[in-house]
Amino acid sequence: MSLTSIPSLREQQHPLIRQLADCIEEVWHQHLDLSPYHLPAELGYVEGRLEGEKLTIENRCYQTPQFRKMHLELAKVGNMLDILHCVMFPRPEYDLPMFGCDLVGGRGQISAAIADLSPVHLDRTLPESYNSALTSLNTLNFSQPRELPEWGNIFSDFCIFVRPSSPEEEAMFLGRVREFLQVHCQGAIAASPVSAEQKQQILAGQHNYCSKQQQNDKTRRVLEKAFGVDWAENYMTTVLFDLPE
């Protein structure tokens, strides 16, 4: 079965979300040795109501020798809101950054597009191989850059956070995410396990990343309205940003 023949919420979403979801899975399958990562059955596909509109969430998760969890989430609220959320959680035995990407759109327009390879080093530095690969990428100029949230100090200097204002800018964003993913997959394949001491430092960095992401009030408010406070807390801490052991 080809990837594109699997029914998916993306077919009903903004074209950039569909293209990005396809791109992410294509690069993963091309470079990495994937196996399923099993979420609790009731959290793989979720339906609820938000302000009278149907809310649908579809989760796909994989794992590899280098990544404990690779999560692609698609969400749709009626015709008002389309969301893509993706994070690759490295195993702490490897010195790898956190790939994260989000698209938020509604009524035919993408309002927010963010992608980054975020450092887990507490001094906010990326591994040198990543630094050199990312520095060599072309500089992109978007007409509507956006400001990072207050908790956004977890992101790298290579982070893109924009409102794409044209099909050309959407294509630029898609191309840059593909480049980030290719750099990341190649970095992961080349990585060797680290010392026990380094593993503890990486764990601390991953904890910092996840705890900062859990502060995202917008995501939490949407989930609380649709499913209640307890469900939202459980989803934020077990599906979206679970902390490594």
Swiss-Prot record:
Molecular function via GO: cobalt ion binding; phycocyanobilin:ferredoxin oxidoreductase activity
InterPro entries from the UniProt entry: Ferredoxin-dep_bilin_Rdtase (IPR009249), Ferredoxin_bilin_OxRdtase (IPR022870)
Documented effect of changing residue 73 to Q: Has 20% bilin reductase activity, only the two-electron reduction of the A ring occurs
Catalytic reaction list: (2R,3Z)-phycocyanobilin + 4 oxidized [2Fe-2S]-[ferredoxin] = biliverdin IXalpha + 4 reduced [2Fe-2S]-[ferredoxin] + 4 H(+)
GO biological process, one term: phytochromobilin biosynthetic process
Keyword presence, Protease: no
Keyword Oxidoreductase: yes
UniProt keywords, alphabetically: Oxidoreductase
E.C. numbers: 1.3.7.5
Function: Catalyzes the four-electron reduction of biliverdin IX-alpha (2-electron reduction at both the A and D rings); the reaction proceeds via an isolatable 2-electron intermediate, 181,182-dihydrobiliverdin. Upon overexpression in E.coli with PCB:ferredoxin oxidoreductase, CpeS and either CpcB or PecB permits synthesis of phycocyanin-coupled CpcB or PecB.
NCBIfam families: PRK02816.1
Similarity-based family: Belongs to the HY2 family.
Protein name according to UniProt: Phycocyanobilin:ferredoxin oxidoreductase
Taxonomic classification: Bacteria, Bacillati, Cyanobacteriota, Cyanophyceae, Nostocales
